[in-house]
C-alpha cells in the first residue's frame, strides 16, 4: 500500500476551466431599439427647431417695416358680414300682388317670368313681388330668399339698399321727374279736351286727329282716353305698367305706404276719377258705363 504524501500548503490546487456565455439576443435587440429611438427623437427635435427658426426669419423679412396692427390684421381671418342682405322690413316694403291683377297689363305675345327660377307666370293666384327700383318682378318666395343674402337685383344688379348714397340721389331725381311728368300729363289732358271739342264741332275731325304728332294715339274703343305710346320691349323679366300707375306705385313705396298686398285696380284710376283704358287694353270696367 503506497504511503500518502503530505500536501504542501503552498501548492495551488487547479480549478476546472470556466466557460463564458454570450449575452442573450433579447438584450442586444433592446439596446439597438433604444439607440434608434433616441437618434430619431433628437433628429425630429433638431428639425423642428430649425424649421421654427427658418419661419421666424422669413416672417421678419416679409413683414419688415409693416406696423404691428397691420400684421395682425393680415393674420386674422376675414369673416363675412353677419347680415349681407336687406333687412326684413325693407324686403316686405316692396309691393306684393297676385298675378291676376297685372295679367292684362301686358300683351299676350310677351311672356313674363321669374329670373330666379326661370318659370313663367301662369297661375293667377300666385303672389309676385315688384322691385320698384328697376320694375323687375319675381315670385315672392324666390326674391325674398334672394334678398336675405343679397342687396342687389338678380337681373340688373342694381343696389336696393335705400340707405346707399346712390339711391338717395336717384330718389331726388325721381321726384323731380315725377313732378315734370305730372305737368306734362296735365298739358296732354288739356290738349285731349281741345281735340274732343274740335271733333264735336267739325265734320272733318277724323282727318285732324290723324295728323296729330305720332306721340299721341286715340283709344280704340271709346275715343275719350289719349295716352302716349311707348316702344314695346321684349323684356320677360320687367313689368311694364302705365306711367301714372308706375308713379303711384313708386311713390307709395318711397313713402313706406305699401301694404302687404296692393290692388292695381285702385291705382289705374285716371285723373278725372274714372277708370279708362291704357294702350288699348281695358284694365277694369269703367264706372257708370
From Swiss-Prot:
It is an enzyme of class 2 (transferase). The keyword Cell inner membrane does not apply. Keywords: Membrane, Metal-binding, Transferase, Transmembrane, Transmembrane helix, Ubl conjugation pathway, Zinc, Zinc-finger. It is a single-pass membrane protein. Residues 181-206 are annotated as: Disordered. GO terms for cellular component: membrane. Its EC number is 2.3.2.27. The chain crosses the membrane at residues 26-46. One of its GO terms (biological process) is protein ubiquitination. It catalyses: S-ubiquitinyl-[E2 ubiquitin-conjugating enzyme]-L-cysteine + [acceptor protein]-L-lysine = [E2 ubiquitin-conjugating enzyme]-L-cysteine + N(6)-ubiquitinyl-[acceptor protein]-L-lysine. Pathway: Protein modification; protein ubiquitination. Residues 188-204 have a biased composition (Polar residues). InterPro entries: RING-H2_zinc_finger, Znf_RING, Znf_RING/FYVE/PHD. GO terms for molecular function: transferase activity; zinc ion binding. A zinc finger (RING-type) spans 114-157. It is found in: Membrane. It comes from the Eukaryota. Belongs to the RING-type zinc finger family. ATL subfamily. PANTHER family: RING FINGER DOMAIN-CONTAINING, RING-H2 FINGER PROTEIN ATL30. The RING-type zinc finger domain mediates binding to an E2 ubiquitin-conjugating enzyme. This is RING-H2 finger protein ATL30. It comes from Arabidopsis thaliana (Mouse-ear cress). The lineage of its organism: Eukaryota, Viridiplantae, Streptophyta, Embryophyta, Tracheophyta. The gene is ATL30.
Amino acid at each position: 500500500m503506497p504511503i500518502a504524501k503530505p500536501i504542501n500548503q503552498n501548492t495551488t490546487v487547479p480549478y476546472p476551466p470556466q466557460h463564458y456565455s454570450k449575452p442573450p439576443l433579447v438584450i442586444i435587440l433592446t439596446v439597438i431599439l433604444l439607440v434608434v429611438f433616441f437618434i430619431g427623437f433628437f433628429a425630429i427635435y433638431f428639425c423642428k427647431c430649425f424649421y421654427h427658426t427658418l419661419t421666424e426669419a422669413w416672417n421678419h423679412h416679409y413683414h419688415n417695416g409693416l406696423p404691428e396692427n397691420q400684421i395682425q390684421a393680415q393674420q386674422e381671418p376675414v369673416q363675412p358680414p353677419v347680415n349681407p342682405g336687406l333687412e326684413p322690413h325693407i324686403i316686405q316694403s316692396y309691393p306684393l300682388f297676385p298675378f291676376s291683377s297685372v295679367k292684362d297689363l301686358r300683351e299676350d305675345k310677351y311672356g313674363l317670368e321669374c329670373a330666379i327660377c326661370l318659370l313663367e307666370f301662369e297661375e293667377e293666384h300666385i303672389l309676385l313681388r315688384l322691385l320698384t327700383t328697376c320694375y323687375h318682378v319675381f315670385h315672392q318666395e324666390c326674391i325674398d330668399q334672394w334678398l336675405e343674402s343679397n342687396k342687389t337685383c338678380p337681373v340688373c344688379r342694381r343696389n336696393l339698399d335705400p340707405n346707399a348714397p346712390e339711391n338717395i340721389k336717384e330718389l331726388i331725381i325721381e321726384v323731380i321727374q315725377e313732378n315734370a311728368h305730372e305737368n306734362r300729363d296735365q298739358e296732354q289732358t288739356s290738349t285731349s279736351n281741345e281735340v274732343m271739342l274740335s271733333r264735336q264741332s267739325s265734320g272733318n275731325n277724323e282727318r285732324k286727329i290723324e295728323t296729330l304728332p305720332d306721340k299721341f294715339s286715340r283709344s280704340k274703343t271709346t275715343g275719350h282716353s289719349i295716352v302716349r305710346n311707348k316702344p314695346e320691349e321684349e323684356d320677360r323679366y320687367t313689368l311694364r305698367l302705365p306711367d301714372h300707375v308706375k308713379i303711384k306705385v313708386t311713390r307709395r313705396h318711397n313713402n313706406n305706404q305699401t301694404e302687404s298686398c296692393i290692388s292695381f285696380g285702385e291705382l289705374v284710376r285716371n285723373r278725372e276719377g274714372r277708370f279708362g283704358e291704357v294702350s288699348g287694353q281695358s284694365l277694369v270696367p269703367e264706372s257708370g258705363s
